[in-house]
Amino acid sequence: MSVRLGIVMDPIERISYKKDSSLAMLLAAQDRGWTLFYMEQKDLYQNAGQARARMKPLKVFADPAKWFEFEAEIDAGLDDLDVILMRKDPPFDMEFIYTTYLLEQAESAGVLVVNKPQSLRDCNEKLFATLFPQCTPPTLVSRRADILREFAEQQGDVILKPLDGMGGASIFRHRAGDPNLSVILETLTAHGTQQIMAQGYLPAIKDGDKRILMVDGEPVPYCLARIPAAGETRGNLAAGGRGEARPLSDKDRWIAEQIGPTLREKGLLFVGLDVIGEHLTEINVTSPTCIREIDNAFGTNIGGLLMDAIEKKLQARKG
């Protein structure tokens, strides 16, 4: 099948060759003979009602010294592409939202966008998880200090975090008797002006925060456990955690079964579930990672699984 695949991502020259999941996807697409086109947010624009971009034909290589090569930039409508991977990392700011509007125009013109632009806007990675209370720890979302304090007192040991953070930034643990709850709440809620999340602390974090990758609603059979550094409560690799690939547990598969149908319904083809012990904590939809670590440990080809799912959807559209 001849496919023209575009990708919107952060600068490719700055990625980590060893760890970057977008590169794994591009290599898998190129292995199928698909034609690749590279874009950054700044390259997207709209003219006369058409979403367009200054895009560069791209070749990628499994070579840590040289992993990409551009051809001459072209100016084309996004509807010249069959599929676009939206792989721009957070922050989830207004520029991110404007990008989804432009991609939504391409989608209306017949392009498959992964993940679906509307769902990228709708599915906040922390709030989305609360739609599955059977899977999550005790969870509260509020900006009122009295409501948050009451929850903290009931739980005794809680994690407090912003709704828009990534990489473990601004995550606090509060235990009964700690004197600093007021300043934590003031800081995170910006003196009561921003909603935050509080969750019951999960001691199982010591054994790792598991990243489970979902491809079109089905779990990859292995996960990456991100184990906190000594003295830390955050498993995020960006916060100093280390990764350890593992097979999924029965509970992991059960959680995936609870969430999979909703992901398919919302056009979320590639998603990362964060699970601590037996509890779902977040659903990452913007630019999930950990493909390379799992592939290297178990010989999987997760990028290939995603391309299979994309090809299936493109064939279904063509009838």
Swiss-Prot record:
This is Glutathione synthetase. GO terms for molecular function: ATP binding; glutathione synthase activity; metal ion binding. ATP binds at residues 151-208. Belongs to the prokaryotic GSH synthase family. Mg(2+) binds at E282, N284. Pfam families: GSH-S_ATP, GSH-S_N. One of its GO terms (cellular component) is cytoplasm. Pathway: Sulfur metabolism; glutathione biosynthesis; glutathione from L-cysteine and L-glutamate: step 2/2. It catalyses: gamma-L-glutamyl-L-cysteine + glycine + ATP = glutathione + ADP + phosphate + H(+). Binds 1 Mg(2+) or Mn(2+) ion per subunit. HAMAP family: GSH_S. Its cofactor is Mg(2+); Mn(2+). Its EC number is 6.3.2.3. It comes from the Bacteria. Keywords: ATP-binding, Glutathione biosynthesis, Ligase, Magnesium, Manganese, Metal-binding, Nucleotide-binding. Residues 125-311 form the ATP-grasp domain. It is an enzyme of class 6 (ligase).
